[in-house]
Amino acid sequence: MVYRAGMSWTDPRGEIEALVPQLRQLRRDIHRHPELGFEETRTQALCRAWLEARGYAPRVCAETGLVADLRPGAPGPVIALRADLDCLPMHETTEIEHRSVHAGKAHKCGHDGHTAILLGVAELLARHREVVPGNVRLLFQPAEEGVRGGGAKVMVAEGALDGVAEVYGLHNWPGFPKGQVHVRSGAMLAQVHELTITITGKGGHASQPQLCRDPLVAGAHLVTALQTVVSRGLGYQGGAVVSITQFTAGTTHNVIAETARMRGTVRSFEAGVTTRVMERLREVIAGTAASFGVKIDLEVDEGYPVTANHPRCAAAVARVAALQLGAEKVSEQCLPMAGGEDFAYLAQAVPGGYFFVGSQRPGEDTPVCHHPDFDFDDELIPTGIGLFLGIVRDRFAELG
């Protein structure tokens, strides 16, 4: 990590670097013992012990999450920083020393690294507690990966952001060059709706399709027709993606199935666009059902809303990143992206700033998030700590 001159309030560079070996070991311990959403009891206990040893009084929030205040009741604004705790229901394929000991559970999105970063921030803030000009609230959030609607929504409902002026979160991203920060005002990530489509026809023998109403044929037509929802429904402006990702029907080779099922997603960056897409999608489904004489049922699981940055918060992140890493390392390229994030609920409740820290190693095909070979790059730990601390200094200087 390269720092530029201009660090104010405190200059934690040496302290950060000295802390990295301990945080690396801690991160790999979390990686070795992954836990799914709302099951992060071991991770929660680890974070609680770390925080209590440094003078915090963490309180449980959202079952397996924690909220910890640096200076409860201090005058001035409260700045919140968030890390997600949970793993993915995936198998670890790597042979790294700290690979997962739990089959079907693995940290393949880097939340172990995010947690280590925020614990490092907690350490540095605690060392300088008396000179921090306000309260910093640390959010250790469970269940970002979509279990029961996500942990961020629960944390908001349980008051984790009460009295908070602004909230910030980061995510490692192997798709961006290592050492870059990607951030913008407005939409960062998409609203995501999950679709389940059930087609009911009339089954029968494969030799007599004329006596059947084949849900597989109707479904094949529907998959193709749905690709026109955006291209012909929204035109060149687009702004949405409709993807059918699962299609199942039948049990054997000589029977026309009674039912077929499809699953997929609708993603967009504006609520109004999502509404138009869903209207057109229902029209296409109704037309397909009528054309093929089948019944088609649509279930929609409304997922996370658009993750949108407040202009003031996005500017603060960009300003701090430019100061610490250089202006050439700050970019809006490839944003917004069509993934979803429950940080959206935090940024709906109070002004928020969400940003990506690149981890793509030069000359390497770095595994992306959710790939079975992914592992968090520990060299991002000091970068993340420095950025979070810089944001805290910047926000107190402006808002204080």
Residue ranges, per PLM feature:
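General structural feature for long, well-ordered alpha-helical segments within catalytic domains
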Residues: 8, 15, 19-26, 39-50, ...
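Metal-dependent amide/peptide-bond hydrolase catalytic core
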Residues: 217-400
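Histidine/acidic-residue-rich, glycine-tolerant segments that coordinate divalent metal ions
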Residues: 88-90, 94-106, 112-113, 128-257, ...
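Non-cysteine beta-strand/loop elements that form the S-adenosyl-L-methionine
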Residues: 80-82, 91, 195-197, 354-360
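Divalent metal-coordination and catalytic microenvironments
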Residues: 30, 68, 81, 111, ...
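Acidic/His- and Gly-rich active-site-bordering loop/insert found
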Residues: 6-107, 112, 116-133, 137
